[in-house]
Amino acid sequence: MKTCFVVCGILLSLLISAQKVTSLDTLTIEKIFGIKGKANNGEYKITIPQNDLSIEVDGFKIIPAMGLGTWIAFTPAKNGTMIMGDIVVTETDLKPVQQEIIRQGLTISAIHNHFVRNHPNVMYMHLGGSGPTDQMAQKAKAVLDKVKEIRGGDPSKGTASSETVTNTLDSKHLDDIIGYKGEMSKGVYKYTIGRPDVSLKEHDVIVTTFLGFNTWAAWQGTPEKAAVAGDFAMLENEVAGVIKALVENGIEVVAVHNHMVHEQPKIFFLHYWGIGNAEQLAKGLRAALDQTGKKQGDKMNMN
C-alpha cells in the first residue's frame, strides 16, 4: 500500500509538472510594444484604438469604444505564450497586413466585417500563434508596424482620440432590461458578457472572456433614437435562435463567422447593428441573450 502511494504521488507530480505553465513576462511585452497594456488574472492585452479612422454608420459616429480597436492578447501556454488578436484593417491595409502575418509565421483564423454601410469600409482580421513570449511579442509588433507603415502614422495618435459621442440613455433602465451592468467611455455605454457556462479551449489552452470569448453590446444616442452595435458568442445550437430573436426585434444581423479554427467546443460569432427606441432594442438583445446559455436538453423555440 505504501509503495502504491509513493508511485501515485510520483505520477501526480509528473502530471502537474507537464501541465504547468510559466507566468507571462509582461515587462518584456511592454518593452517590445513600447506601450503599457492591461493585465487580468495572469493574462495580458495590448489595445490600439484606431483614432486615425473617421467612420460613420447610418449617421452615427463609430469611435474606438464602439468596437474600432485592434488588440493582441497574451496567455500562458506550455511552450511559452499563446497569442490571439484582432487587427482592424482598411481595404488598403488588408493585403500587405495579411502578408506580414504570414511572413511572421503567425496564422490567420478569420477576416470579416463588423458593420455594413460604413464609410470608409473596415474589416477585422484575427491572428494567432504560440511560442516564447518575446518572439510572439516581436511578431505581433511587426504586424502592427506594418499597419503604421501603410497608413503613414500611428493609428492611436489620430485626431479621433479626443472624440466623444452623444449619450443621454438611461443606463440604469438598460441594465435592468439586459440584466448586466455596463461601463461608460467617451459617450459609449458598453456591456461585456462572458460565457462561464462554456469551458472553451484553443490548442488545449483555456480561452477566457478577456481573450475575446464574450458577447458585447456598445450603445450611444438618445432614448428615442439609440444605436447599438455588438457581438454574440454562440454555441452551434444557439445560432439560429439568436439570429431569429434579433431579426424579429428589428436588429440587423450583419455578420456570422468564426474567430478561431481549433477551438473546442465550436463557437460562432455574430455581429449586429440596431437603431431605434432604446428600450425596444434592449428588449431585443435580452430576447437574444435568452437563447444562449441553455442546457443541452432545453428546446429552442423556433415558432
Feature annotation, model-predicted:
Residues 19-121, 128-267, 273-303:
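Long, contiguous binding/interaction regions
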Residues 1-4:
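Positively charged n-region of N-terminal signal peptides that target proteins for export
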Residues 13-18:
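N-terminal signal peptide c-region/cleavage motif recognized by signal peptidases
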